[in-house]
Amino acid sequence: MSQNFRLDKTGYINRDKKISFKFNGKKYFGYEGDTLASALLANGIHLVGRSFKYHRPRGFIGAGVDEPNAHVQLYSGAKTEPNAIATSVELVEGLVATSQNCWPSVSFDFGAINNLLNKFFPAGFYYKTFMWPKNFWYKIYEPIIRKAAGLGIAPLKPDPDKY
């Protein structure tokens, strides 16, 4: 697997130590000193997520903790970590990351239909639309809105680590 998007000799990475990781189920490699974001970019991965409301494609635009688009889910099970910022995640052997706010995949997202219906979703529409009947809020409206909100999935099992 070539890394056509990586500079040949410069940078602060250790090219003697290759590190393998998975992103969205596919295996890639990077080097010691890479962040998840830099390794993804080196492997030609530019699409990492979708916007909250309209599910528009999102890629990297920052290089630090201020990155607004590259939020990923790390690992799975009890050790899962939602909303990790890919530009600040150090690449380690066996890292498993997935895109958030997309289904069935980041490249083909059914939620993107919202983009076509944007005339029906003005800013703040949900504050007025889902007011009646009152008892629908917690059982119907809120779960649907939360699922579409683009946040990662919190761990369902207790934390296995001892502190």
Ranges and model annotations:
Residues F21, F29, R58:
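Short glycine- and Lys/Arg-enriched binding-loop motifs that mark or flank ligand-binding interfaces
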Residues K22-F23, Y163:
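Short hydrophobic beta-strand segments
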